[in-house]
A protein has these predicted regions:
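Short glycine-rich phosphate-binding loop at a beta-alpha junction
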Residues: 45-53, 187-189, 291-297, 334
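Phosphate-binding and adjacent anionic-ligand microenvironments
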Residues: 250, 288-477
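Proline/glycine-rich low-complexity loops and linkers
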Residues: 129-162, 174, 181, 266-339, ...
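An N-terminal, well-structured beta->alpha segment
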Residues: 1-67, 71-72, 146-185
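N-terminal small/polar loop signature for handling phosphorylated ligands or for N-terminal nucleophile
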Residues: 42-111, 204-264
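Gly/Ser/Thr-enriched, mixed-charge loops and adjacent short helices
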Residues: 112-246
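A short, gly/pro- and small-residue-rich
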Residues: 110-133, 264-279, 349-360, 366
Length: 477
């Protein structure tokens, strides 16, 4: 039998992902299962839950994954099709040692991959590279495992509702629901983008006592309406239109596997991830003053300032869901978030990124406030900033460019933060350039205290990109 070898490009920093039948094959799923099972055996673990998203290749990959896990002697619980946070939830709810999600997240429809987690810590970086080494060494365990189908959808929805301040709809009334009824009935628009969160979103909306408008709830591997990535403004155009036309209090969107959230206020403005984090942080810090809150390197200075003003300890961290979770565990942070809409609640929750739970928490904030979400947005200190700018770049070149940029800035005597890429701070603002760990892109962002200073920062960033022979994106022209 020929020794299996993964394509080098699929073993990423936070997960395994590639293009189905180009760099990622059914055989890879089998050997992901064999190697992960070996890892678990070496660490005295044997119970694992597995789920998949709605991509056309996901059931095929999941079948091979489960086959390998069972043949390696593991107790496998198949929780079916759903969002990534439902899989994370199942690990805790079903008392598993680990979980694997088959998902392409928000990547194009022909992509797919695997997100792995351990109950007691994230699984990433060297752990993922270690799977490749186990496969190379053919260090596998054979055994007679088991497989059981377990439906956790209703339990997951119940868990979401347990922290929702809105009463449940009449078909699910509790004895004391009258005491929970809101002062006004909210109107909420939802957009699953035909991703894996659609069924959960539908079930949840039926049980929250509010008026709901659902967009693209059917799970469809072709994403026929728009791509499920709420960080891209054009993907929120349908949601914005519904919010404005129907007079909604807010609109909520999810990415392809439901671990990220996008939010639109009642005036149709996008609430970016770092703005959303201000609202979450203020709420939590009322009850937990002095708590540590983490934001990624792409976040606005406003967020770090507002955390401090509210009595918290702000901490800047590297972008990446696994890196953030590891930093939360290390610092005992109660909340963390990324510009991309990954929000991690350790306050009242498990500490993993869950776009659906984040939706419940922003609904609570809007419901309990005497101000609209638009009013809350306008009250934030105003800066001039670009959105997250993605510049296409090859896997091989993107990290080289960041290193070249660092060397050039050092020679020029420019100080910068290199916690994750390059973030310069002029006192009037900052710009960032980092290599994405999940896509073949460079990520840039600029923020300043005025339009004039923003333009100066964009000019400076353009010059640095030109030095590295990077094509200047339209957003920086």
């Amino acid at each position: 039998m020929t020794k299996h070898k993964f394509s080098p490009s699929i073993l990423r920093a936070y997960d395994i992902r590639g293009i189905y039948n180009q760099t990622l094959f059914d055989a890879d799923a089998f050997f992901v299962g064999k190697s992960f099972a070996s890892f678990l055996h070496k660490n005295g673990k044997k119970k694992i839950s597995v789920a998949c998203d709605g991509r056309s290749s996901s059931p095929l990959l999941k079948a091979q994954l489960i086959k390998a896990l069972v043949e390696s002697g593991l107790e496998v619980l198949d929780v079916g099709l759903g969002p990534t946070p439902m899989l994370y939830f199942s690990v805790y709810h079903l008392d598993c040692d680990a979980g694997i999600m088959v998902t392409g997240s928000h990547n194009p429809k022909d992509h797919n991959g695997f997100k792995m987690m351990l109950r007691d810590r994230p699984f990433f970086g060297d752990d993922i590279l270690g799977l490749g080494k186990l496969v190379e060494a053919e260090d596998f365990v054979d055994g007679e495992g088991s497989i059981e189908d377990v439906d956790v959808k209703s339990d997951y929805v119940d868990r979401m509702l347990s922290d929702c301040v809105l009463g449940q709809s009449e078909s699910h009334l509790l004895d004391d629901i009258d005491a929970m009824k809101p002062k006004k009935k909210m109107k909420i628009a939802w957009d699953a983008g035909n991703g894996a969160a659609g069924e959960i979103m539908t079930d949840l909306s039926k049980r929250i006592d509010a008026d709901h408008i659902l967009l693209f709830a059917d799970i469809d591997a072709n994403f026929p309406n728009h791509h499920p990535d709420p960080t891209v403004p054009k993907n929120l155009e349908d949601l914005i239109k519904v919010v404005l036309d129907e007079g909604c209090d807010l609109g909520i969107a999810f990415d392809g596997d439901g671990d990220r959230i996008g939010v639109v206020d009642n005036e149709g403005a996008i609430i970016w991830g770092d703005q959303l984090m201000v609202f979450y942080a203020r709420e939590i810090l009322k009850a937990k003053p002095g708590a540590t809150i983490i934001a990624d390197v792409k976040a606005s200075n406003v967020l770090f300032d507002e955390i401090a003003k509210a009595g918290g300890v702000p901490l800047m961290g590297k972008t990446g869901h696994s890196l953030i979770k590891a930093k939360m565990k290390e610092t005992k942070a109660v909340l963390a978030g990324e510009m991309s809409g990954h929000i991690f609640f350790a306050d009242k929750y498990y500490g993993f990124d869950d776009g659906i739970y984040a939706a419940i928490r922003i609904i609570n904030i809007v419901e309990q406030s005497s101000f609209s979400l638009a009013d809350m947005r306008k009250e934030l200190p105003q800066t001039c900033a670009t959105p997250e700018i993605r510049i296409e770049c090859s896997e091989e070149r993107k990290f080289q460019i960041v290193e070249e940029l660092k060397e050039n800035l050092k020679k020029s005597g420019v100080s910068f933060n290199d916690i994750d890429g390059v973030r310069t701070n002029t006192g009037k603002g900052w710009w960032l350039l980092r290599a994405s760990n999940t896509q073949s892109v460079l990520v840039a962002r600029c923020e300043a205290d005025s339009v004039e200073n923003l333009e100066k920062l964009k000019v400076d960033l353009r010059k640095n990109l030109e030095f590295c022979a990077v094509k200047i994106p339209e957003e920086l022209q």
